[in-house]
């Protein structure tokens, strides 16, 4: 029998209040130690027995800020990694950095005032800026408990080892006949001054105008067209109407004259014209939108270059030359009105093709004729639509987003960008548009600094020029799987690790990172890149809308990490179903900290009795212990199944029903008197149940569970090395379920009775319990526990239909 003095002495060793900051900083440093890396977190190349689990984690763009979206997937990645290690897998958990691209260039160009024309200095400063940003983001990730294998699997897309893989993959695609240089209309962002891929643009609703303009007919009369782009008048090559439109049937084939520019164009009939839009007559310009491109190709129309790289008008005989697009629109309206060609202007909202992906640009894009490098993508649409079905999507509905994107593809992938900070495209070209690849042994290289493999073009003899453009950043990040699994560098490792087990990412980059990785890996390896794709939803602001600085609803995960703890934040982020959007509120985090404080208190209460002690299973378990073990078995099995299905929400929710409501509020109270008496059944059961509980919770809340495991057990250097609990030996008995149900009912009923009669819980009372015969017989088996737990002098029983408690004098 333990004395109160002995218990109090032990309790002094366990702080009363859970201090997340102190505990978390301690364990984060321990996890980073060489010993823990070697024994816990290292991917063991030499291990030929354990199953392998490879996680393809997102390499975030190095902006310097770890926002809540980053915190979410970091938590998911770390949780999966820890669970799979507990499950016995040899886990490869990498972390890369998507380092190159326009945002960094703009920071260096405008904040540091470094001109990009000074290429060497500019690139040097881009790398320095990138490394500063990585340092900040890495520190934030570690503060959230994230533990990838920094030692060997941290990569940067600008580094030579990674760049070599990027360039080799491009040479391989060239050998397959999939890369070519050609001239034609491309998506162009005048603000960013670079070409874009189809995946980087999208439609945004913006305020606009619909101008109704008179076009005189050469033979007399007029046709009124409606356009949202009157500034493109000088580039108009034809007028189009629907061939079945009764208003214009007689005009098809006639000649219209462009006002102000006196240019003759033909009126054509085409089914793509919307009769209901505007007047049903439109101008075909080069180029106002994707439909103009289709018409130009279909009818072999001439082209006029009207807009330059900076979004200024040219080739209008001085009428609009030098004006920005918006300025030119206003000016042309004034001129048309002045000359009597303007019928009317309507203000309306319409969808404008804009630079939307991975950019805060959001500017309207234009179509400029440029010489660019393309990867042939469209020819693979059918194969992609078949092969994507081999990947399992979590949740399953996310597969349709990828399918829809593949079906919507209309353009090959333009991979060249008119920027500086990026992966050099390993090619030279001649004026006949012959593309010459670099030698593989020269990789990685910059063709602007390296001699070409030939003096002149081997196909036509013309001089060779280096490709000065850099690669689209999605070229960089689309080879993460190929890089990590050693496709080009380690065939033995590749066979062991490919395809990756799971890809983690958000919904916002399905049509970019997911699609490009899927496409490139399929073409290069002949296989899908990963077996599973886990796609998380968005973390919204507290008001339930998308986080935005302009709205003032942006929540930084580190703002209150010291106050509430990383584990509380992780519990909050994972208390939502994968794929769903959800609001993040600090009030919810506060609630999760209360849950962890409850866990801490339960550990402290248990410590004097089970701390660092071993207990053999007794031959006869107390009925209450049998009940809790049965509940425990279900909790463990249900949690493991939930983890396997990435249903972290289910694990978090079960902590409330199992730990809080059953273990803390019921079981611990019921066994206190037996703990004091050092009852082996109670000690064994509590020790087993609590260890398993910490193991199950560890992947989500690693700091507090590692600390409590170390205090209560400490058999191994990390709780991860314990492996998952095995509960198959626990027998299941439906009668024990009945016992548990009646215990909960009885304790709740008697506590309510005391509260209603304003009797403090520690004060003893006499009670009459009323209920069916089965209930009375069951409760009598644990009467002593009920009496000692609820401070009862005497219990009198009376049969009745309804279970209730009455106060006896």
Curated annotation (Swiss-Prot):
Q: Looking at the record's lineage, which domain of life comes first?
A: Archaea
Protein name from the UniProt record: Valine--tRNA ligase
Q: What is known of its domains?
A: ValRS has two distinct active sites: one for aminoacylation and one for editing. The misactivated threonine is translocated from the active site to the editing site.
Gene Ontology cellular component list: cytosol
Enzyme class of the recorded protein, top EC level = ligase
Any one Gene Ontology MF annotation carried by this entry is: valine-tRNA ligase activity
Q: Which reaction does it catalyse?
A: tRNA(Val) + L-valine + ATP = L-valyl-tRNA(Val) + AMP + diphosphate
Q: For the motif 'KMSKS' region, what are the positions?
A: 546-550
Q: Give its localization.
A: Cytoplasm
Q: Give the residues the record marks as binding ATP.
A: 549
Q: To which species is this protein native?
A: Sulfurisphaera tokodaii (strain DSM 16993 / JCM 10545 / NBRC 100140 / 7) (Sulfolobus tokodaii)
Query: What is the stated purpose of this protein?
Result: Catalyzes the attachment of valine to tRNA(Val). As ValRS can inadvertently accommodate and process structurally similar amino acids such as threonine, to avoid such errors, it has a 'posttransfer' editing activity that hydrolyzes mischarged Thr-tRNA(Val) in a tRNA-dependent manner.
Q: What is its EC number?
A: 6.1.1.9
Entry annotated with the keyword Nucleotide-binding: yes
Q: Which Pfam families match?
A: Anticodon_1, tRNA-synt_1
Where primarily located?
cytoplasm
What keywords is this UniProt entry annotated with?
Answer: Aminoacyl-tRNA synthetase, ATP-binding, Cytoplasm, Ligase, Nucleotide-binding, Protein biosynthesis
